[in-house]
Amino acid sequence: MLTIGVLGLQGAVREHIQSIEACGAEGKIIKRAEELVSVDGLIIPGGESTTMRRLMDTYQFIEPIKAFAAKGKPIFGTCAGLIMLAKHIEDRDNAHLGLLNVSVARNSFGRQVDSFEADLEVKGLDAPFTGVFIRAPHIISADESVEVMAEYDGRIVMAKENNILGCSFHPELTDDHRLTQLFVEMVKTYKTKLAV
């Protein structure tokens, strides 16, 4: 069985685990860097990016997550997780993990009172997906190597580059598990290549 970890530092960790399990994979909360070896893919959930970075530094996650990605293991960052993955962050001198060749702007749809839901056309899905946006970032620009997966109001809100997937919204806060399933399929593909 596939095992997908959810970084358990902050955010809707339990909801991500439930979504993973609804897709037929095993979900595991990751609280220590050494636990990364036990999972085939990793979800970095939403939360507050500055706090998340501080916790990642405290628990020494930055280099182990970079090494995890370098092995080709898939990573999915949602909301603040997208900010953690981005190579460039507007109004910030340096990136956090720098694994996805995109530039992001934080809180680009407004503060928490401006949280909203929107139906999105997502590449690979046959019907719209309802995105839950909460103090969401968006992707300002993406490298040629990056596949744009979804846009909202002219802004990129989901992108994929090789084994790295990121979105501005919270797929775990709906009962629609198709985006988690998309990530599970990425992890399956990685495992299949490994077995050859």
UniProtKB/Swiss-Prot annotation:
PANTHER family: PYRIDOXAL 5'-PHOSPHATE SYNTHASE SUBUNIT SNO (PTHR31559), PYRIDOXAL 5'-PHOSPHATE SYNTHASE SUBUNIT SNO1-RELATED (PTHR31559:SF0). Belongs to the glutaminase PdxT/SNO family. The active site is at C79 (nucleophile), H170 (charge relay system), E172 (charge relay system). Its EC number is 4.3.3.6, 3.5.1.2. It comes from the Bacteria. This is Pyridoxal 5'-phosphate synthase subunit PdxT. L-glutamine binds at G47, E48, S49, R106, I134, R135. GO terms for cellular component: cytosol; glutaminase complex. Catalyzes the hydrolysis of glutamine to glutamate and ammonia as part of the biosynthesis of pyridoxal 5'-phosphate. The resulting ammonia molecule is channeled to the active site of PdxS. In the presence of PdxS, forms a dodecamer of heterodimers. Only shows activity in the heterodimer. It catalyses: aldehydo-D-ribose 5-phosphate + D-glyceraldehyde 3-phosphate + L-glutamine = pyridoxal 5'-phosphate + L-glutamate + phosphate + 3 H2O + H(+); L-glutamine + H2O = L-glutamate + NH4(+). Pathway: Cofactor biosynthesis; pyridoxal 5'-phosphate biosynthesis. The lineage of its organism: Bacteria, Bacillati, Bacillota, Bacilli, Bacillales. GO terms for biological process: glutamine catabolic process; pyridoxal phosphate biosynthetic process; pyridoxine metabolic process. One of its GO terms (molecular function) is glutaminase activity. The gene is pdxT. Signal peptide: none annotated.
